[in-house]
């Protein structure tokens, strides 16, 4: 693959960024994220319409994450020599098909099939996103392009639930997914128009994905990714009970806190390219260290609403650096195997999200209200130490 990348760069060196293609990728990512979380705000009407409980309907989110984890691991092995332009178009088609299957679902099994299609698109798209980006812009512009893509993620995360809830009341949950299918069609046409041909890896250069973990610093990097995202979900999954019981926020106050977090996350993502240009390793070590301190502050003084709100804003600003930073690390330190590294990264993140939420929930129920914070802070501190000591970083 390294020879293949080198040959392509030599023959087709990128001198000007293809921003139209980058924005089409960002739009596709935003659509994937919005559709992933639409059921969260539509569970009740979906459950009532299909004659199932809300808990069972909630598995429509779980199955997407589960399929995405496995899709991310095996998609790069499956699409080796395929032009990545056609692969991205396929993912957009799967996104659209998923929405239509869910919209017309008359049984829980058809609903799950639709959501599984989304999982394949979600996991596959994230697996190739870093390598895709580095083939659309010059090396010096990669952090900026990644910040555009992750900025779209931040916006999608902020608007997905309230938009789904509002439109669900207005036009019904099935028509919400029909509207999402229309967005998928727009994705397809935009990608067809803007994304250039991006040849895949020749079949004779296939390599085992997991051999990457034998490279110096790669295993440490993946462990650091796991701990940082597990730390995030150990806390953020339970931000509602923590903020309502520790700081005394009501529903309206919590909504404003979450909105502030979302806006801060978008701002942090927008500023990430400037910070990462200075030092990727400093950002990847510094961000979790700041989050560890924030968890400590919230544990000690979180009963003060001003302090709690400030921590939420700082958390949103700071954590935004982490996903962009690790994708930048892949494009620089593992550029010759960016797709395979991306597939491992996505699987690690999905596993971390699941483990972080599960362990955080156990701690909340069995240890105490601030235990998710202490768990999160500990994981973030360990991440900062591991990055500082073991993670290797190549200069751009």
Curated annotation (Swiss-Prot):
Its main location: membrane. Gene3D superfamilies: MFS general substrate transporter like domains. Residues 43-54, 107, 169-175, 237-255, 303-305, 365-366 are periplasmic. It is a multi-pass membrane protein. It comes from the Bacteria. GO terms for cellular component: plasma membrane. Pfam families: MFS_1. It is found in: Cell inner membrane. It catalyses: inosine(in) + H(+)(out) = inosine(out) + H(+)(in); guanosine(in) + H(+)(out) = guanosine(out) + H(+)(in). GO terms for molecular function: antiporter activity; purine nucleoside transmembrane transporter activity. The chain crosses the membrane at residues 22-42, 55-75, 86-106, 108-128, 148-168, 176-196, 216-236, 256-276, 282-302, 306-326, 344-364, 367-387. Residues 1-21, 76-85, 129-147, 197-215, 277-281, 327-343, 388-396 are cytoplasmic. Keywords: Antiport, Cell inner membrane, Cell membrane, Membrane, Transmembrane, Transmembrane helix, Transport. Involved in the efflux of purine ribonucleosides, such as inosine and guanosine. Belongs to the major facilitator superfamily. DHA1 family. NepI (TC 2.A.1.2.26) subfamily. This is Purine ribonucleoside efflux pump NepI. The lineage of its organism: Bacteria, Pseudomonadati, Pseudomonadota, Gammaproteobacteria, Enterobacterales. The gene is nepI.
